Amino acid sequence: MRTKLKITEGIFPMPVLMVATYNEDDSVNVMNAAWGTMQERDTVALNLTEIHKTVQNIKARGAFTVSIADAAHIVEADYFGVESGNKVADKFARSGLTASKAETVDAPVINEFPICLECRFIEYQNNEYGCGVIGKVVNVTADESVIVDGKIDMSKVNAIAFDPYTHGYYKVTERVGEAFRDGLKLKK
């Protein structure tokens, strides 16, 4: 038997993405965004409203970075979602994390998060189905601690996912299958 539930953003897992920009004074701003995905291999889509300080910064600078949050920094990642850059100018400084300038875009890389996508702002879309930032990924970097044989080993990243049903975070660490291979067992 199935139970009927209220409608919510019910896709799981939802990524916990750290979207980083520079403010007007060159200080770092970061927000926590769960509504994000890849549109193509090199295009990021983030469902963010224009009231966010981060969106204002993206439009002004033409760039942003997207990092994948990890379990070791759950407190900081959550803080970036509960505190507004419009209200707290030194939000990033209060986190205790550090940043460096991205190699290819005018945006910061949060050093403590293991994977970072450097993005060039393409456009802001606003229509009946939602609104958001579209960016072109121009560089991807990863901390050496998560690299095995020249590739990212997601079991070492300890990425976290947002649970929209109970508003919790879960660690995403165990590989359970081989994409585009396991299903071939049923193909006739």
What is each residue range found by the language model?
Residues 1-188:
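Basic, polyanion-binding surface patches
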